[in-house]
Amino acid sequence: MSKSICSTGLRWLWVVVAVLIIDLGSKFLILQNFALGETVSLFPSLNLHYARNYGAAFSFLADSGGWQRWFFAGIAVGICVVLAVLMYRSKATQKLNNIAYALIIGGALGNLFDRLWHGFVVDMIDFYVGDWHFATFNLADSAICIGAALIVLEGFLPSSDKKTS
């Protein structure tokens, strides 16, 4: 028995497209308008700062000689496939989980595109307090973190709310 895509979690794939457009658009603007290492202050505690990340979160394995590019690309593809299957198997009415999965897929694909096209991930958001700076990140990273937080949140909701949220 075949399911209509609109009756499955794949109905929420538009979120993936939105994340990709916003993420890749922001990275394009940075690449076109910033020199590597350039910083522009937006607000107190928030800068735009063009950085290249050859590793994963917090530049994990960034200095590993290049193999990590393909390793992290493979992980991204695997995660996207698993989450797309989960979306297909879930009902479209399971909004919270499906939106979370779509945010993670969109973020993973945004960073995957960077890895494959540029050989590095473009980062640009620099949050700081005083002299302490958080790791520079991008909108794809934000989408992944928000998606993961939504999955954790869903785990704390009562089961009656999970069916409709």
From Swiss-Prot:
One BP annotation, GO: proteolysis
Enzyme class: hydrolase
UniProt pathway: Protein modification; lipoprotein biosynthesis (signal peptide cleavage)
Membrane-traversing stretches: 12-32, 70-90, 102-122, 137-157
Signal peptide residues on this chain, from the entry's feature table: none
Mode of membrane association: Multi-pass membrane protein
Keyword flag RNA-binding: no
Keyword terms, alphabetized: Aspartyl protease, Cell inner membrane, Cell membrane, Hydrolase, Membrane, Protease, Transmembrane, Transmembrane helix
One GO cellular component, as annotated: plasma membrane
Active site: D123, D141
Family recorded in the similarity comment: Belongs to the peptidase A8 family.
Biological function: This protein specifically catalyzes the removal of signal peptides from prolipoproteins.
Protein name per UniProt: Lipoprotein signal peptidase
Protein source organism: Klebsiella aerogenes (strain ATCC 13048 / DSM 30053 / CCUG 1429 / JCM 1235 / KCTC 2190 / NBRC 13534 / NCIMB 10102 / NCTC 10006 / CDC 819-56)
